[in-house]
A protein has these predicted regions:
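Compositionally biased terminal segments of proteins
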Residues: 1-220
Length: 220
């Protein structure tokens, strides 16, 4: 980020993906140790087939205020521990990223576009653009259906796509699964960018340059 023209923007949360291929019973043990040490007073799980877990209100301020997990491999957390969680309906306000990564095509895209920086695995800017674009479409559709969706969240994902575009070179192109590539084509059709939008975000590129850049990135 320090090598890009983007201004620094602090985040309120961290989106962390646990790769199922690397999870072990030992990880599950360490995870529950973390939850118990944090003294999380509210421990919940979804009562449907999609496995969602939420931990809130830790007794120590040194621990995250809330942890949300969408598990593709729930058995790693241990059946005995999971039985003690309070069943809840699948929340409407779950992380859009969590829901997206239940899709095998998006999950494989993520795995193919991760890099290591100082020992930490991160997603490339172009992969983040794909996830942000998908999240923007999903939240926009839910809002149109009358579901409770914060307009600020919808706008944030769209603005993040525009900000991240400043980190993409014109000759960059991704190899995407067909399903993902087709959905990115839909995103481009729905996306509108004005000069005022870019000025507010401090982006110097022209609106048509952004569209062309994203079209080339997605192979469209």
């Amino acid at each position: 980020m320090s090598n890009t023209p983007l201004p620094f923007r602090a985040t309120h949360d961290l989106d962390i993906v646990l790769c199922v291929e690397s999870l072990t019973a030992e990880f599950g043990k360490k995870f529950w140790e973390f939850i118990h040490l944090g003294g999380y007073q509210m421990q919940e799980k979804s009562d449907g087939t999609r496995k969602f877990y939420r931990f809130r209100n830790p007794s120590s301020m040194a621990y995250p205020d809330m942890i949300e997990l969408f598990a593709r491999k729930p058995d790693v957390f241990g059946e005995k521990e999971l039985q003690g969680l309070t069943p809840i309906p699948l929340p409407d306000d779950i992380s859009s990223l969590s829901a997206i990564l239940l899709n095998d095509d998006y999950y494989s895209m993520m795995l193919a576009n991760k890099v290591t920086w100082e020992g930490i695995s991160l997603l490339t800017p172009e992969a983040l653009i794909v996830l942000k674009a998908k999240a923007w479409m999903d939240l926009s559709d839910r809002k149109e259906r009358g579901e409770h969706v914060d307009s600020k969240d919808v706008k944030k994902h769209r603005n993040d796509v525009l900000r991240l575009s400043a980190m993409i070179s014109p000759d960059m192109q991704m190899k995407l699964p067909e399903v993902v590539m087709n959905e990115m084509a839909v995103f481009l059709h729905r996306l509108t960018v004005t000069r005022n939008d870019l000025d507010q975000l401090g982006i110097r590129r022209k609106p048509d340059e952004i569209i062309q850049l994203l079209s080339g990135l997605f192979g469209k």
